[in-house]
Amino acid sequence: MKRALALIAILICLALPARAVSLRTVSAFGGTDASALAYVELLREYEAQSGNVVEDNSGTSDESWKASVLSDFAAGNEPDLLFFFACSADSAPILRKMVPLSEINAAYPDLALPESDILREADGNVYAIPLRPYFEGLFVNTDLFEQYGAPLPDTWEHLEAAVAIFREAGVVPISVSLSDIPHYLAECTVLAASSPEEYTSRPTALDEVPRSWHRGMELIHHLYTLGAFPENALNTSEAVTSELFRQKKAAMQIDGSWFVNSLPAQSMDTTVVMPMPSSDGESTAIIGGVSMGFYLTRRVWDDPSRRDAAVALLGWLTRPDHLKRLAAQEVTGALAESADAMAARTADMVRPIQDDMNKNARERWLLECVPAVAVGDMTADECWARVMALAPFGAQIAPPAAAALN
């Protein structure tokens, strides 16, 4: 209540006769994002109450969008408020241009912005207000499993059996694009082969890479040879493969929790999400955490004529009731039950490998290695040698063989 009153007071002050302030925002609430409309509505409500103007540039959170945001920061063209990835290799390059929440709270104590430890950066500061706790898992069209008598993929053996049944029936077993957004597949197969300790290790030299990471990449090749993926997996898009799943032309899809919002109402009781099964049957870990949050940039903070307006916008967007509007998932039935069960497993969650990789290494792993390993043009050993040559997790002394591949 105290925070809400403080925010109302700021908005009232801003609404007094004065020159309108112009603010620039960038977010991932673009394209087909399920929260895009709610985000735009919140911006318009802020404009109506404050008299200020918000110029928003939202996009879809793919690799090109990430690169565009990072390029703008590098060029000194950062926005005033940003909704972006948090506590990851993606956020590291921009932190020096962000304002720690502790600094904002010190100047606006009644606003009491939440400082979540889960998003505490290496320097000890929290810069982002979190939204969208997430998980990654295996989405399953249970009606297709019933129709074809396939076992649910709750073990690796059942997964392979289901792949064989659906391939024989002419149904795509696992809908994925190996050329567009392959990171869910890569992360989940490495996890399937790893213990939580192995998965969460961050090697700084090639000989430190867990053997389970090699086995995880080999699982991609194994699934490819089993015919688990679409025939055009090497040259199709994620939009196309996701539509195959939604239209019940594919039995499974590995994806993030945000995928639930794109599923049609008629699938609420015929689609569930479950953990990717472990290849050795031992690990119960799942990939998850908090992926994104709202930031305030130093550019607007250091501008006395616009600081109050920007802080008010940050407070407005991150009010608890407004965060619920942005995080709303319109799902019901079996899908909602399974998604809630996955989201509740916070003790089992491990952070994605790619979140801690630098951009060049991440792109080499996901966009070069994954398709090449899948078809057999590159071995898992060659893959990790090429990735580690780019020091994905920080400084290293690369072995000559790895360095030569750079």
Question: Language-model features: where?
Answer:
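A structural signal for short loop-to-beta-strand junctions that line the ligand-binding cleft
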Residues: 72, 80, 108-143, 172-173, ...
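C-terminal capping/gating helix-and-loop segments adjacent to ligand/active sites or protein-protein/ligand interfaces
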Residues: 121, 328-397, 401
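Extracytoplasmic/periplasmic solute-binding protein
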Residues: 127-129, 136, 160-206, 221, ...
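Conserved N-terminal structural module of periplasmic/extracytoplasmic solute-binding proteins
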Residues: 18-90, 280-282, 382, 393-406
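Hinge/lid segment of periplasmic solute-binding proteins
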Residues: 85-136, 151, 160, 185-188, ...
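Short, solvent-exposed loop/beta-turn-alpha elements that line the ligand-binding surface or hinge
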Residues: 102-112, 194-215, 265-266, 278-286
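Glycine-centered hinge/linker elements that transmit conformational signals in sensory
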Residues: 163-165, 203-234
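Extracytoplasmic/periplasmic substrate-recognition and gating elements
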Residues: 21, 44, 48-49, 147-148, ...
